[in-house]
């Protein structure tokens, strides 16, 4: 307790986190892209290489997963306007939201129905390519749909993949690995939903269940993989490859906006709200967005009040040296995908200058917004995916934030607010009914 009091004396906002209050923190250390980029340790060239790799795999994905064929084997999600939801939020919160609200439907991405279809699938493909190239079975000029042949399945079956997950990352890595032919083990934390485990098992994936939280599942997965030289551990806390898989979203969104005739520039700012668990997904996407839109995009991470690991780490500067449990928070939340007690130190340090802020919201708030979105727009998401939905109202309510960035009323009126919906497209009907019943 004494340590917590000392921490609060130095970092007053910790008091609100401990009290589980919905909290908004605008980052005083935010810099321009030019100043912040060197700290990421990755470049636009790295993201372009990831983009090219996904293009090489597109013919394979189009055949392996027919639902991706129409898009030519590219796994990408729609951007839709949600005007009725915007009005509903204004009414519920008594707060005008200037500009236009859009929803990025990663919740409905092909193959695994979440944002993790970006990073998780990309890292599995990267590993498969590396093994096949090293074995001389493939060149980068080949048509990668040859990977569907029995010879390749046989080759990949000598190797295994392991990952620790609260659910969605395990789902994307498990399904993709099993399809390639890898043996795959997913170490699931206590928060993981039963249907996600069942789906993985139906694909022939080994699921190891823990009574503990995410950190323990990752640690156990890492340990199990160390004893097997043919086992590759996908490390959600530290993986640059996962991060780059997410970062590809930036250029893709830029192309989608161009197609829609949507302008993003100094007088038409873009605000993006990303749900955050350990940080890899939102961190990678935010990095890609910064490369695509520069200083005209403003990124915010959203976390449950019971799992504010990234806000705690970045705000105190302690990063992965502190967990929410250290300040007496239980890390128990209905937003199972965000139930992480200790943030990625890699992501926190890489992105702390490129984030405009972080905020927390209550589980009940997520349930309420889940219900409103279903009623107003007919779109159904899982609780985690609603974390970003509270963002626009927080920004529009903060005159201090607007003044610090010198936003005029005209700029705010021209703004685009993009809510990144991270998952929910594959939630079973009965489970979704339970979610909807919890909204007010």
Curated annotation (Swiss-Prot):
Catalyses: D-serine = pyruvate + NH4(+)
Q: Which InterPro entries match?
A: D_Ser_am_lyase, Ser/Thr_Dehydratase, Ser/Thr_deHydtase_PyrdxlP-BS, TrpB-like_PALP, TrpB-like_PALP_sf
Q: Which SUPFAM superfamilies match?
A: Tryptophan synthase beta subunit-like PLP-dependent enzymes (SSF53686)
CC cofactor: pyridoxal 5'-phosphate
In the record, N6-(pyridoxal phosphate)lysine modifications are located at 116
Note the superkingdom of the native organism: Bacteria
Q: Which Pfam families does its entry note?
A: PALP
Q: Does the keyword Amino-acid biosynthesis apply?
A: no
* Enzyme Commission code(s) on record: 4.3.1.18
Q: Which residues cross the membrane?
A: none
The UniProt GO MF terms for this protein read: D-serine ammonia-lyase activity; hydro-lyase activity; pyridoxal phosphate binding
Q: Which CDD domains match?
A: D-Ser-dehyd
Which GO BP terms, alphabetically?
Answer: D-serine catabolic process; isoleucine biosynthetic process
Q: Which UniProt keywords apply?
A: Lyase, Pyridoxal phosphate
Q: Which HAMAP family does UniProt cross-reference here?
A: D_Ser_dehydrat (MF_01030)
- Xref: PANTHER family: D-SERINE DEHYDRATASE, THREONINE DEHYDRATASE, MITOCHONDRIAL-RELATED
The family line of this record is: Belongs to the serine/threonine dehydratase family. DsdA subfamily.
Q: How is the subunit organization of this protein annotated in UniProt?
A: Monomer.
Give the protein's recorded name.
Answer: D-serine dehydratase
Q: Which organism is it from?
A: Salmonella typhi
Q: What is the lineage of its organism?
A: Bacteria, Pseudomonadati, Pseudomonadota, Gammaproteobacteria, Enterobacterales
């Amino acid at each position: 307790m004494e340590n917590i009091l000392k921490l609060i004396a130095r970092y007053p906002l910790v008091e609100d986190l401990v009290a589980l209050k919905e909290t908004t923190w605008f980052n005083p250390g935010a810099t321009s892209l030019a100043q912040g980029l060197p700290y990421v340790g990755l470049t636009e060239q790295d993201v372009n290489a990831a983009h090219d790799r996904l293009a090489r795999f597109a013919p394979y994905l189009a055949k392996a997963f027919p639902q991706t064929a129409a898009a030519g084997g590219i796994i990408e999600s729609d951007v839709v306007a949600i005007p009725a939801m915007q009005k509903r939020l204004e009414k519920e919160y008594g707060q005008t939201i200037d500009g236009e609200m859009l929803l990025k439907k990663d919740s409905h991405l092909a193959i695994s129905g979440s944002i993790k279809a970006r990073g998780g699938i990309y890292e599995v493909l990267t590993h498969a390519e590396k093994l096949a190239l090293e074995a001389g079975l493939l060149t980068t000029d080949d048509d990668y749909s040859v990977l569907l042949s029995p010879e390749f399945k046989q080759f990949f079956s000598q190797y295994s993949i392991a990952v620790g997950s609260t659910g969605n990352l395990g789902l994307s890595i498990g399904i993709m690995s099993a399809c390639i032919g890898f043996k795959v083990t997913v170490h699931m934390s206590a928060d993981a939903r039963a249907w996600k485990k069942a789906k993985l098992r139906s694909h022939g994936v080994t699921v190891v269940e823990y009574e503990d939280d995410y950190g323990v599942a990752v640690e156990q997965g890492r340990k199990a993989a160390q004893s097997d030289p043919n086992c590759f551990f996908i490390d959600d806390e530290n993986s640059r490859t996962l991060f780059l898989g997410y970062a590809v979203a930036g250029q893709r969104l830029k192309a989608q906006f161009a197609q829609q005739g949507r302008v993003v520039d100094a007088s038409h700012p873009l605000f993006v709200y990303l749900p955050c668990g350990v940080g890899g997904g939102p961190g990678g996407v935010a990095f890609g967005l910064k490369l695509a839109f520069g200083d005209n995009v403003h990124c915010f991470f959203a976390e449950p009040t019971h799992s504010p690991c990234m806000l705690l780490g970045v705000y105190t500067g302690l990063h992965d040296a502190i967990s929410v449990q250290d300040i007496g928070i239980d890390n128990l939340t209905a937003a199972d995908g965000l139930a992480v007690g200790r943030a990625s130190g890699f992501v926190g340090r890489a992105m702390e200058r490129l984030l405009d802020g972080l905020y927390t919201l209550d589980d009940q708030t997520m349930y309420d917004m889940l219900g409103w979105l279903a009623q107003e727009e007919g779109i159904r998401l899982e609780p985690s995916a609603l974390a970003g939905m509270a963002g626009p109202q927080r920004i529009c309510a903060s005159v201090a934030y607007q003044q610090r960035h010198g936003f005029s009323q005209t700029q705010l009126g021209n703004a685009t607010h993009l809510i990144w919906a991270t998952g929910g497209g594959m939630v079973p009907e009965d489970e979704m009914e339970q979610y909807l019943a919890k909204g007010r």
